[in-house]
Every structure is written in C-alpha cells, then in structure tokens.
Amino acid sequence: MQYEIVSAGENVGDEPERERPVAQAAAAPGIPRPAALPAAGAARRGRDLPRERLLARGPAALSDAELVALLLGSGLPGHDVFALAHTLLTRFGSLRALLDAAPDDFKGLRGIGPARTAILVAVVELARRALAEKARERPLVDSPGAVDDYLRLLIGTRPREVFVCLFLDARHRLVQTEETAHGSLTRMAVYPREIVRRALALNAAALIVAHNHPSGAVRPSAADRHLTRVLRDALALVDVQLIDHFVVGANDTFSFAQAGWI
C-alpha cells in the first residue's frame, strides 16, 4: 500500500417447551410399539438441545453453526434453523466473515430479514464495545492482548485499508478510538497534521495507531515504516507520545514497538 502523507500545507419466555413422553402401548402379539417421539417432536427437541447444552455446559460446548442458530431463533418452511445457519456460514466462508458483514451484505438472503440482520450486526458491535470498555479500565500498555483482540475485531477483516488512532490519557487508558483515513485499493492518504490536532483536542498524552492489511499479511511495508517515523516526529513536537503502530490482519498483528521500530 502506498501512502499519501499530507503535510500542513496540504420467542416470548425463556423456558423451552418440553416434549411430553409418549405413552408406551401395551405389548401385544403382532402390535409394534409406537415411536418414542413423533417426527415433529424430534425436530423440536433437536432445536432445543443446543440451548440446553449451552446452559448446562457453557457456550464452548456448541459448534459455530449451533451458536448462529441460537441467534437466528427459527428456520424456514422445509428448512430448520440449523440448515439456515450452515447456509450462512457457507455463504460468507467463515464465522468471522459472517459476523463482520455489513447490513447490506445480508440483503437478498432468504430467511435473513431486517430483524435477523440487526441481531447479527448488534452481536459484533456489543463485542467491540465490551473490548473498548475493557481498554478504558486499565493502561493499554499493561494488556497488549486486549489491544490485539480489539484491533482485530475492529479492522482485521475490512476489505479496504483503514487507519485508526487510539487516543490515550496520561495513564495510557483509552480515551477515544477514531478512524482517521480510509484507503482505496492502492493508496491511503494519512494527515499527520489532523491526527495531531485531534490529539490536542482530546487532551491525549499518547497514541496507538493501527491499520489493516486486507491481504492478511501483516509484515510492514517501507511506506508503513516511513509513515510511522513522520507521525512519531509530528506528535513529539506537541509532547504526545506514539506508543505503537500495529499492522492488523484477520488472524495476526505486527507491533512496531515489539520489533524495536519506535
């Protein structure tokens, strides 16, 4: 990615309905016993089982498709909710891609209307907010794993490059996260002057910056290293510390600080 570095001059109820046991017919010569459950009851029991396992054993006991099915709630005529969940995972390629999808990505998908779209999008937003809340509770330099998780969830699977700034207070706790630049397929214009201005407006004492590589490869380019030096020097002029620059992929991150490049 080439950078343009622009200078100053430029269901009601929580309890599932339980199946009532089918009475066993008296054993009589030549008369078979009835099935333990009718077909419809078996299907409903199958739908309830993941919910019961989650409550009894925790969410880790469920597969990705089962967790998605719990979010969806019900299926379509002729297709149960598990088939719908599998269809979604196949359509998007992975759970991460499904949950990172924008609302428009669900348009035209059979069985996914506005209500289910809102649920799927809200789940990821809740996760982002929970991680941001965690980042505000203690210095980010003391919890690098939380920073990695937050950044991967925030920009790790974006289809285009995004440059984000994490503005920190004097104790290195998160004050605010802002997306300061968005790239095309080949370029992204980053304005150090504007980043400095926002740091001063937010009374930030330090910054962590990050951008994603949609390819998934997180090794920094020469342009990434040059941008980091320019931004570090611009912030130093106003006594704001650049703590780290992360390059983020869907499954990995690269830290300039850990590499000794800041």
Swiss-Prot record:
A motif (JAMM motif) lies at residues 211-224. Residues 22-43 have a biased composition (Low complexity). Pfam families: RadC, UPF0758_N. Residues 140-262 form the MPN domain. Residues 1-45 are annotated as: Disordered. CDD domains: MPN_DUF2466. Gene3D superfamilies: 5' to 3' exonuclease, C-terminal subdomain, Cytidine Deaminase, domain 2. GO terms for molecular function: metal ion binding; metallopeptidase activity. SUPFAM superfamilies: JAB1/MPN domain, RuvA domain 2-like. The keyword tRNA processing does not apply. Keywords: Hydrolase, Metal-binding, Metalloprotease, Protease, Zinc. Zn(2+) binds at residues 211, 213, 224. One of its GO terms (biological process) is proteolysis. This is UPF0758 protein BTH_I0781. It comes from Burkholderia thailandensis (strain ATCC 700388 / DSM 13276 / CCUG 48851 / CIP 106301 / E264).
